[in-house]
Amino acid sequence: MAQLSSLGHLTMLADFQMPVAVDDHDRKLLSDVAEYGWHIPHIFADESGPCYSFSVGFYLKFGHPEILLMGLSQPIAQKFINLIGGHLMTGRVFRPRERTDVLAEGFSCDFIPIAIQHYQYYLGYDVWFYRSLKQPFPALQLVWPDKQGRFPWESDYDQRFFSLQKLLDVA
């Protein structure tokens, strides 16, 4: 059973145990989660796919799904994830298939649930971090539109952007 703070934020998951760091990357992640509430790993593009960034700690701190986004540079992705974290601190919740423009003026984005089959490959640090939980942690992918504001599931979406963000809502 989770315990809620006076703000309604999740402060502790009953079966969560902080993992033990085995290297400097782990120590940095655990330090960031302790100090800021979350950490943002960035994975660079390679032959298997586009770059992506994701949160570690949103579920522990806020009871909110972790967030992943693809195809944006590290500084921009980090800015978006930190903006989401700032909104979570005020009690805002982002839900699947909820289009929003609160992250950037004139820029809408949407959120889709990430299929659990993608967790190990794309959210490996989250899998490590939450391994003590009896149930899988939730995760959402932030999906951004093409230059005309269309999303990948819309018929006129600019096909050139498909290579920058693989949709992870299906296996």
Q: What does each model-identified segment do?
A:
Residues S53-G57:
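A short, structured beta-strand/loop element
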Residues A2-G49, Y59-G63, L68-A171:
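Acidic, proline/glycine-rich low-complexity IDRs
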